[in-house]
Amino acid sequence: GVFCGELCIKASCSIPGCECIAGLCYKN
């Protein structure tokens, strides 16, 4: 639920532990 400060285009995030949700990277 915490925004990782990264946008995701290909449903992948470069920041470890972060997942792509609705175009944004979130972690918990």
UniProtKB/Swiss-Prot annotation:
One of its GO terms (biological process) is defense response. The presence of a 'disulfide through disulfide knot' structurally defines this protein as a knottin. This is Cyclotide vodo I2. Keywords: Disulfide bond, Knottin, Plant defense. This is a cyclic peptide. Contains 3 disulfide bonds. Coiled coil: none annotated. Probably participates in a plant defense mechanism. Pfam families: Cyclotide. Disulfide bonds join 4-18, 8-20, 13-25. Belongs to the cyclotide family. Bracelet subfamily. It comes from the Eukaryota.
